[in-house]
């Protein structure tokens, strides 16, 4: 099996770029952020503070997270319920950052992620794929873009969906998320030593996909 580990900050386009590249390569795309978001959604639904590590840990035995692959893409199932459309809100995003800093949560999901890579050729994206989850991946990418460019892209996404967005507020959220992700004690966001740095601040979406596909084909 061939594994591609893609790490990088929130809003750099990891998921959309990896998904398109996986389709072109015939690989399975694994959005690990969606897995953590599913945990965070359950925590919020239970009225638990996502920063309260013991309380979050107590919920884990009662959570069943499954990934289902359909022609439309990866679906997230939480205790049998399809929650794919419920995990992208700002509230869930901030709760995800807190939950993912809890060692017990990361340990809970680690084997699920590794099992997917053992059984499939995968493009897996997240925050610590190349450093922790798949340290032996054949290719590691650190995909990033400037906070300002990531905020602009998010505003454009929301506008396309017919939603108003405050650029300055989104930029602050991104900067706060970057700080939390890079300063947490457990698996902080950082490039693996042997990762290829891919800054797509000035790339179109298609250019990012083509660059990623090219890197994979060079290594295979």
Annotate each language-model stretch with its function.
Residues 14:
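Conserved lysine of the Walker
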Residues 9:
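P-loop (Walker A) phosphate-binding loop of NTP-binding proteins
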Residues 6:
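Hydrophobic anchor at the beta1->P-loop junction of P-loop NTPases
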Residues 33, 80, 109, 123, ...:
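Residue-level signal for inorganic ion chemistry
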Residues 68, 113-119, 130-132, 136, ...:
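Small-molecule kinase domains that catalyze NTP-dependent phosphoryl transfer to phosphate-bearing small molecules
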Residues 84-161:
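ATP-dependent NMP and nucleoside kinases share a basic, alpha-helical "lid"
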